[in-house]
């Protein structure tokens, strides 16, 4: 992981199920990164109020959970909405930022009242100008997330069904392209002729 992500040796990386790791640890962290969600492959045990509460318990007082959502759906009742509503039900502050050039959304969750001032101060302390510029861009795109009623729990986490909705949307989008090509150019357009 250190080689792949270019992390310095001072960063500790644990590669295992995040919930199991946290359950066995009393350690607290400044940042916990969760990167486990991709369209239809959503681990239910990393999607519930109970999981996000466990993450919250392992954050230092000014700590932040950063979640990478690699999802294409932003529809009402989507897996994105369920995950963000669930996070917002646990943390005092939840903000999102779209990632330029792809379908990812970064979600930042914290209980620190001064999170934005801390974020800006941290950017000001960066010595890598490119990284500082990128983080300023992220800050400009941050949008507060107001939680709703779509909450996932250990007892109710229909992530497979929600993932299938995403798959249906993906297939529908692909089929629309081919239907449009067939309507405008006929069969020869589809066959490249």
Kindly label every feature range from the protein language model:
Residues 1-64, 70, 74-80, 88, ...:
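The AdoMet/dcAdoMet-binding core of the Class I SAM-like
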Residues 66-68, 95-96:
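Short catalytic-loop micro-motif centered on adjacent basic/acidic residues
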Residues 93-193:
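Soluble small-group transferase modules, centered on the S-adenosyl donor enzyme superfamily
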């Amino acid at each position: 992981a250190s080689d792949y992500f270019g992390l310095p040796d001072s960063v500790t990386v644990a590669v295992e199920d995040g919930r199991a790791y946290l359950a066995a640890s009393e350690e607290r962290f400044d940042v916990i990164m969760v990167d486990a969600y991709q369209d239809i492959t959503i681990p239910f045990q990393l999607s519930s109020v109970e999981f996000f509460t466990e993450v919250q318990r392992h954050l230092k007082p000014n700590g932040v959970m950063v979640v990478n959502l690699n999802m294409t759906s932003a529809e009402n009742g989507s897996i994105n909405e369920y995950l963000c509503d669930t996070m917002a039900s646990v943390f005092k502050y939840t903000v999102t930022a779209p990632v330029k050039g792809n379908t990812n959304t970064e979600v930042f969750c914290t209980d620190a009242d001064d999170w934005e001032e801390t974020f800006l101060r941290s950017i000001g302390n960066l010595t890598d100008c490119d990284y500082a510029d990128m983080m300023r861009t992220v800050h400009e795109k941050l949008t507060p997330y107001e939680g709703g009623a779509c909450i996932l729990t250990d007892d109710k986490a229909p992530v497979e069904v929600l993932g299938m909705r995403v798959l249906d949307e993906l297939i529908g989008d692909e089929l629309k392209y081919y239907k449009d090509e067939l309507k405008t150019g006929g069969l020869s357009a589809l066959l490249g002729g």
